[in-house]
Amino acid sequence: MDMKKPFELRVKPIKNGTVIDHITANRSLNVLNILGLPDGRSKVTVAMNMDSSQLGSKDIVKIENRELKPSEVDQIALIAPRATINIVRDYKIVEKAKVRLMDEVRGILRCPNPNCITNSDEGVENRFYVISEEPVLLRCYYCERLIEADEIESQF
């Protein structure tokens, strides 16, 4: 019996740009929303539910000819706290960094408590303390409401 190796489709490497690896499974579309993609110009590759020895399964996003702003990386950390950002130049990874949640998150999310002062006309900036990184759990600085990962994800 002739056992042939199954055909394996591989995504071609990018010459320049960013690869976001180890995204929590099924959250790559949230990452695209954070980055304002698709935008009609950028070449983007999305791989979802890929096998991962670390996570079980993961998503990957490749964006050609674009490097991320620190504010974008901060937002990605909220929905994919184990993500890795790889900067690619001339087909080589020149920089690799894990996303990191800051101790405090400001101005990115809104508090889901309708009675929180940040949801009034006072103009108070949203501010949250990071209680847990995995899973992500935040506490509102003002009303102390806990915000879990699914509530965070729904805002992107």
UniProtKB/Swiss-Prot annotation:
Q: Name one GO cellular component term.
A: aspartate carbamoyltransferase complex
Parts of the chain that traverse the membrane:
none
Q: How does it assemble?
A: Contains catalytic and regulatory chains.
Q: Which amino acids does the record list as binding Zn(2+)?
A: C111, C116, C140, C143
Q: What does this protein do?
A: Involved in allosteric regulation of aspartate carbamoyltransferase.
Supply the gene name: pyrI
GO MF annotation, one? metal ion binding
Q: What family name appears in the similarity comment? A: Belongs to the PyrI family.
Name it: Aspartate carbamoyltransferase regulatory chain
